[in-house]
Amino acid sequence: MHGVAMPHRKKLPPAYETVSPREASPKQIQGNFAVALGGLAGNNAHGAGVIEALYRCGRKPRLISCTSGQIRFTYAYLRGLTPGSEVNPYSMLQRHFNSAQPFKDLTDVNLNFKLMTWPFQQIRPSVPEFSADMLGNLTRSMKQFLANPRDFSVWREMYRMMPARTLVSQDTLFDPDVFSDIARLFNADTGPDGHGIGVMFNAYDFVKGEEYVFMNGTAATLTGHAPGAGSGSRPWIKYQAITEEAVRNALRLYEYGFHEEGDLLDGAYLRGLILSEIPNKGNGIDTIVVGRPLASCWLGDAPSSLIELRDMQTEVNFLGSYLGEKGQIELINQLLRTGRPVAPPANATPITILEVEMDRQRGWWEYVLEDEAVFNSAFHRTRTEICPRLELPMAA
C-alpha cells in the first residue's frame, strides 16, 4: 500500500548439529525419484547437504539434474558411491573450507586470506589482470570520446570503468584433467560397473540466446531427448552429449569475464534448476527432490543499500526461472487430476515435488563464501523430512 513502509523482518534459522564424516557405506537402493540441484555461488553447500543426506539414507536417484557448482558436488556424489571412496560431497566441502576459507564463517578474515593467497586458489581474484583490464576500459572510453565527443558521458564511462573480470578459474592449473574426469564419470552410467544414474546439466549461449542441456545416455533415455535433437516446444533448447568442453562451459561464470573463446556460460544464469525434462511417462520417476539454493521469499531486512538491492535482484531472477519450471509441472498435475481446461498431453505423468529450500538469508557478500551451517541444515532437513517420503521399490 502507498504510504506504508516495507516491513523489516529478520528470520533466524535454527541451529543444527554438525554433520560428521562418513563412517559407513549404506546399501544404495534406487528409488522412483530424481534430484534437481541448483548451483549458486556460496550456497552450493545447500545442495551438497541434500545429496549427502540421500546417500546416508540409502536413497539413490534415477536421475540428477545439476547446474553450476552443483556439477562438482554431483561428481563427488558419484565418486562417493564406491565404498571406501575418500571423495564425496561432505569431504569435498571440507577440503574447500581447509584450502579457501580456513577461518570458518569470519567474512573479513577469509576474504583477506583469499586475496593474500590468490595464486593458490582454485577460483582466485583477478588481481594481476586488474590493471590491464582497467586500462582496456579507459582506452575504450577515450576512443569513444575522440570519435563522438558530443554524446560522451563522463558519468556513464565512470560506471563502465570497473572491469567485468573479477575472478579467474585455476581449475586446470591444479588439476589438468578435472573437466575430463567429470565428463568421464558422468558418462560411466552403463555396464556392470556403471553408476546407473542419469545426469544432465546446462550451459547458455549468450550470443545466440540458446540453452544447451548436456545428458549422459541414461538421462537421454529417461527424458526421451536424444543428443543432437532440439526441444519440440522450446526451440531455444538444444540437447547434447556430455563432453569435457561441455563441463568447462557449464562452469564458466560471469565473473571470469569474456576474454576466453566461445560464447557458452554457466547455464544457471538462465535456468537455475532443470525440472521440465524430467517428467516422461514410463520412465519410472514420480517424485523430484529439489535442492533450492534460495528461500521462496525474502527472509532478511528489506534492502537499504545498493549491494543489498543487487542481492534481491539476483534472488528474484533465480526464483523466476524456477517457478516457471515448477508451474509447468503443477499445470500438468492439474490437467491429469481434473482434465480441465484441456486434456493432458499423451506422455503426461504426475510428479510430486519435494523441496528443500534455503532456510536463511545470505547476502551478496556471502556468495563468495560457503557456510557449514547451510550444509548442516540441508542435510538434517533432507534426512528427517524428505528421505522418509521416498518410497523404495518393492522386492521382487
Residue ranges and their predicted role:
Residues 68:
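Catalytic nucleophile serine of serine hydrolases
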Residues 2-64, 75-396:
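Patatin-like phospholipase
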